[in-house]
C-alpha cells in the first residue's frame, strides 16, 4: 500500500514486533525499515493513529532456559491490544544452550517450542497474532507415507489452537499443507523476483537465452518450480527422474537405482538447478 492511501486505512492495532533469538538481526532491520517508512507517512493525528510513529516497534521479550534445558517465555512489556508479529528462523543452528553441562545447538524443534512459549505469553492479550516463519517448520513432512506422522499439519494446527491468526512463510515445500487450517490465514510468499535479481547481480556474465542457459529440476518434486522459472527466464527446462527398486526398503524408503535425465543437450550452457528443498547430500 502506498503512503498516500494510509489516511484511508485505520491500523488494526498498535504494531508490535517480537523477533525471537533466532531472528534478532533481521527483526532489527525490519523494525528500522518500518520506523523510517512510517515517519515519512502523512497521517492524521486522530486517536486511530495513536502510537503510529515510534522510535521502535520491537517488544522486549525473552526465552531464558533452566539448567535442565527447559525454557519459558517472558514479556517484559505489555502487548495488550497490539497487532503482534513474531519472527522465527527454525533453521538457525548457530544458537546453543547448556544442558547438564553439555552444549546443545538449537534444533528446529527447540525453536518451535520457544515460538509456542512466546505465543502462550501473548495469547489472550494481543489483538492479533501473526507468525512470520521464512522456513516453514516440518514442511518436508507434509504428507504421509505408510505409518508416518503428519508433522507439518500438526504444527500448523498447534499454532492456530493457541491463538495465532495468520501464518506467513516463503516458498513452502508444498503449499497444500494449508488445508490443515482451512479457516485460518496462511500465506506462502514466492520470492521469484528476489531470486532472479540475486542471480543476475552475483553472476553478471549469465545470459537468460535458450542457447546460453537452461533450468534443471533434480527430481519430479521440483518440476513445478523449474517450469515456472524457465517460463520467466524464457529458457528450456530439463529434469531427472528417479528409478527405484520397489521390491526393497532401505531406511524406510525404496532405494534409487538410477537417475535418468529428460531434456535437451546441456553442452556449453549455464545450468541453474532449481529444487524444492536441498537436504544434505541426497538430491
Can you say where each PLM-predicted feature lies in the sequence?
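PRPP-associated nucleotide enzymes
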Residues: 1-283
